[in-house]
Amino acid sequence: MPGWFKKAWYGLASLLSFSSFILIIVALVVPHWLSGKILCQTGVDLVNATDRELVKFIGDIYYGLFRGCKVRQCGLGGRQSQFTIFPHLVKELNAGLHVMILLLLFLALALALVSMGFAILNMIQVPYRAVSGPGGICLWNVLAGGVVALAIASFVAAVKFHDLTERIANFQEKLFQFVVVEEQYEESFWICVASASAHAANLVVVAISQIPLPEIKTKIEEATVTAEDILY
């Protein structure tokens, strides 16, 4: 059986892995990966708008991996519309990259549960195989954190190099052309970053759990026999 010191740290490692699992689920469900400002370029060109009038043509957009919302401002007031990524919008995006992001996050969910299971196993007993011990916990956390980091990097690539926001903003727009003037990563994106950070923190936790505690030795007093004791 592991000592109380290791049990405490392995328990913390299992909680961190479980928190990563929950964070990824939240990031998948909440449609707030990125928000931005979109300019109705067609409206600006039609009225030859000045700099002061541009604010009348700037709308808002936010989206996640499955759905989002857009507010069109084309000089006639804001018009809000909801949209879903699947099944039609994804065809206008880099579909392979978008699906890869989802698959990576689903894989990260499984790896987070595996790393949690290994931490619980080490908390209950001392595994007889090295791969099931602290090294195994580190391995699964490296894999889980790496997969989440790869999903984050893929999303950033889709935004920066594949004009993700602009493609979404112009989906099913036949009369108006929208241009992205501002982009900002939102809470779901940073939740994913926190998930990867939880696995990185687990590596530190496992390393701390291997620090040997100093043994507390009790000093045994030796019995002294005097001449008076012998006489008695």
From Swiss-Prot:
Signal peptide: none annotated. The chain crosses the membrane at residues 10-30, 101-121, 139-159, 188-208. InterPro entries: Clarin (IPR026748). Glycans are attached at residue 48. GO terms for biological process: auditory receptor cell stereocilium organization; sensory perception of sound; stereocilium maintenance. It is a multi-pass membrane protein. Gene3D superfamilies: 1.20.140.150. It is found in: Cell projection, Stereocilium membrane. One of its GO terms (cellular component) is stereocilium membrane. Its main location: membrane. It comes from the Eukaryota. Keywords: Cell membrane, Cell projection, Deafness, Disease variant, Glycoprotein, Hearing, Membrane, Non-syndromic deafness, Transmembrane, Transmembrane helix. It is linked to Deafness, autosomal recessive, 117: A form of non-syndromic deafness characterized by prelingual, moderate-to-profound sensorineural hearing loss. Sensorineural hearing loss results from damage to the neural receptors of the inner ear, the nerve pathways to the brain, or the area of the brain that receives sound information. Plays a key role to hearing function. Required for normal organization and maintenance of the stereocilia bundle and for mechano-electrical transduction. Belongs to the clarin family. PANTHER family: CLARIN, CLARIN-2. This is Clarin-2. It comes from Homo sapiens. The gene is CLRN2.
